[in-house]
Amino acid sequence: MKVIIPVSPINSLKTRLSEFLSSEERKNLLLNMLRDIKKALEGLDVVVVSRDDEILDFAKYELKAEIVKEKYKGLNNAIKQAFDEIDDEEVIIIPADIPLIKKKHIEDILKLSKDYDLIIASSRGGGTNLLYLKSKNLIELRYEGFSFLKHLEEAEKRNLRYYIYDSFLISVDINTPEDLGEIFIHGDNTYTKNYLKGLGIEVEPKHSSAGRFVVKRR
Amino acid sequence: MKVIIPVSPINSLKTRLSEFLSSEERKNLLLNMLRDIKKALEGLDVVVVSRDDEILDFAKYELKAEIVKEKYKGLNNAIKQAFDEIDDEEVIIIPADIPLIKKKHIEDILKLSKDYDLIIASSRGGGTNLLYLKSKNLIELRYEGFSFLKHLEEAEKRNLRYYIYDSFLISVDINTPEDLGEIFIHGDNTYTKNYLKGLGIEVEPKHSSAGRFVVKRR
């Protein structure tokens, strides 16, 4: 089994955070999120796919991951390229921006994998934040948009035994300043929270249509 | 054991949804969410606390719940009043706006309750969307604000055996049009989704700092 983590290039990274974090800080945020994810994946083989050499170097030397230099456009193609370059059939695909994922989740997935062909956990907004496939070519990958529903549709169409893994912590992907709030609530002892705290970021509760957090920077 | 559901008055209800749903529709949304929650609680005794007679009538006659007419201001006081009016020690407290909760979650909580004094599941934004207490006066209730952290603090202070129950579906509370999006993704076979569909509401994916969904009404 291999865990595949596709990573967007640093310069296109998290532009929705750009009012809040400089480009250098967004890069460091990404690297810290990858450190947290790697910790959850302890003992498993990790493959990082990216077109960005700085990320690939980090993945290789610090995360001790296999690396795949992305050749084609689009997330689905990047993952398929990684599929082609590994021998393993069994894969888990996770994004680079879910730093609240824990070892416990992966242990659950490995247990469930004995009984299911496909295991999926959603992001907020109908995306896919974890996808386990007993065999990498079982379905057509359909990331982007409401991929959670599309992947379930694939599973149904092919009569796969599938399981929906319900996790709030996996659902939290970091795209907006608002999202950083969840790191402050749930991210104790993560690299990501420690990094953000070091930048002087603080979070307060709010309840309005504009969101659930006030995220500020000292 | 009793499950306590505090419910705000209908006229103060979900004002953040008011651009999108009329007052009558927001009321019906609430009643449908309560129907979904009641389904998840099948077989358990439910107590609805509210100052609103229409809600209390619905709770009594349709949900077959015990009812408590709220006398004091504030969510914590409403729950404490319910504590006073029941004989049971063991309680689960859940809000009225988490229609994606499932029977499976409650079964998990009941199993875990053998080993823990306090079980908590967070909302998005650091609130508390499920709280199990082995004995109702074990902690000081501290709803409002980042109550998830405050309740954990209470548990630590008193050396309770506590468990953080990680569920995306429980984390989804319905406060904004954006939140309705999650119902469309995850709410198949719920009263709530069926009701919203009947109103001509539709949801599309979006990825911007303004949110993850485009929620429209035909």
UniProtKB/Swiss-Prot annotation, chains A, B:
Record pathway: Cofactor biosynthesis; coenzyme F420 biosynthesis
GO molecular function: GTP binding; phospholactate guanylyltransferase activity
Class of the enzyme per the UniProt entry, highest EC level: transferase
Record-level GO BP terms: F420-0 metabolic process
Keywords: GTP-binding, Nucleotide-binding, Nucleotidyltransferase, Transferase
Keyword Lipid biosynthesis part of the UniProt annotation: no
Pfam families per the UniProt record, alphabetical: CofC (PF01983)
Domain of life from the UniProt record: Archaea
Keyword field contains Cytoplasm: no
Catalytic activity: (2S)-2-phospholactate + GTP + H(+) = (2S)-lactyl-2-diphospho-5'-guanosine + diphosphate
Enzyme Commission number(s) from the entry: 2.7.7.68
Family matches, as Gene3D superfamilies: Spore Coat Polysaccharide Biosynthesis Protein SpsA, Chain A
NCBIfam families for the chain: F420_cofC (TIGR03552)
Subunit architecture: Homodimer.
HAMAP family referenced in this protein's UniProt entry, alphabetically: CofC
Function: Guanylyltransferase that catalyzes the activation of (2S)-2-phospholactate (2-PL) as (2S)-lactyl-2-diphospho-5'-guanosine, via the condensation of 2-PL with GTP. It is involved in the biosynthesis of coenzyme F420, a hydride carrier cofactor.
Family (UniProt): Belongs to the CofC family.
Name the UniProt record assigns to this protein: 2-phospho-L-lactate guanylyltransferase
Gene of this entry: cofC
